[in-house]
Amino acid sequence: MPPDLPRFSLRLHQGLTPQACRALAASAEAHGFHTLWFAENPFGRAILPAVAACAADTSRVRLGLGILNPYQHHPTLIAQEAAVLDELSGGRVRLGIGSGIAQRIAQLGTRYRPLAALTDAVQIVRGLLRHETVTYRGRAFSADRVALEFAAPRPDMPIHLAAMADRSLALCGRLADGLIVSNLCPPAYTARAVAIVRESAAVAERESFDIVQYLPCAARPDGAEAREIAKEAVGAMLIALWPTGNDWPAQRETILRLSGIARPEMVGALDRLRRGERAGRVLDDRFISGFALAGTAEQVIAQAAQYRRVGADELALSFAGPQPAADAAYLARAVKRLIPDGELAIDVRRSPPDSG
């Protein structure tokens, strides 16, 4: 019997040019991936031009804005952008909102208030998509008698929130339709986050909730080669995303505890990586099993099933290495061999282009 698998999607990072995104979008649609999630952080490539180009190039694959932060995209602008992209794509947009990376938001010269920012953004965006005239006074963002001057194609467009800390996860359950679990979060953390979100959603009487997990992935016929590629990807993410210094946010301490990696080991690994040592020499297999999918296609599928067991409905995979389209196609073919009747989590052609 085939394993219970999550949906498989692609995450397109900001290191990719719009032209590269278009090529990957065509490949993803041809091989049946569910969604293209476009990642945006301050000061990298803005995602909206690539999303628009990919919307025009494709007809089935969904397009995830994952994520827009309200400090750079005011909530009124998020509603405008999401609605117009939904028009362009024929209703294929999936909206993700997050508070952004604290250190980078600080560079904008604005006060970082993640809970307030998420709350205000969801309230304003929902009202505008419903074609309401929104007057809202928030702690971070406000709107005064604002209405879209056109009707959004889907007034009930689902909203996913990127959240990590416990209070943000609880907020996500109360207000949103889905959670985006960030990179560098092991399965045990995902299980814990899912429990917090679903408990909060139940209290708010929200019945359905979608869990999307971001993960780097390396799938190759040579499993050892794939694991080395994955180490380089995880190493780059640790350098970019893990806080410097010793004063780590509580959620990072929780992630570390649930990964099985001791704090001194992580501190030592970060120091060596930041001094330029190659990740293949620094990181052992625990960093790969905790923070990536890696190996042959069959091994990656087994690892993906583990995330499904802890509550992830969808994996948005960043394919590491020099040939992401080929590696993604290799994995897709293996999934289709495993579930040959076409009823597979990876296939979008049998379902309508709604939120997923």
Put a short name on every predicted segment:
Residues 45-68, 72, 121-124, 128, ...:
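Alpha-helix-loop-beta-strand connector modules within alpha/beta enzyme cores
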Residues 35-57, 69, 101, 105, ...:
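Glycine-rich, proline-tolerant flexible connector loops at the mouths of alpha/beta enzymes
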Residues 6-19, 68-76, 153-164, 217-220, ...:
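Active-site mouth loops of central-metabolism enzymes
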Residues 1-65, 157, 348-350:
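N-terminal beta1-alpha1-beta2 module of alpha/beta enzyme domains
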Residues 16-28, 78-81, 161-171, 230-233, ...:
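Short, acidic/polar
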Residues 28, 32, 54, 85, ...:
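Conserved, mostly hydrophobic/aromatic
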Residues 2, 111-148, 190, 199-309, ...:
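An alpha-helical appendage that flanks or caps ligand/catalytic pockets
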Residues 6-12, 36-38, 63-66, 93-97, ...:
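Hydrophobic faces of well-ordered beta-strands that scaffold small-molecule active sites
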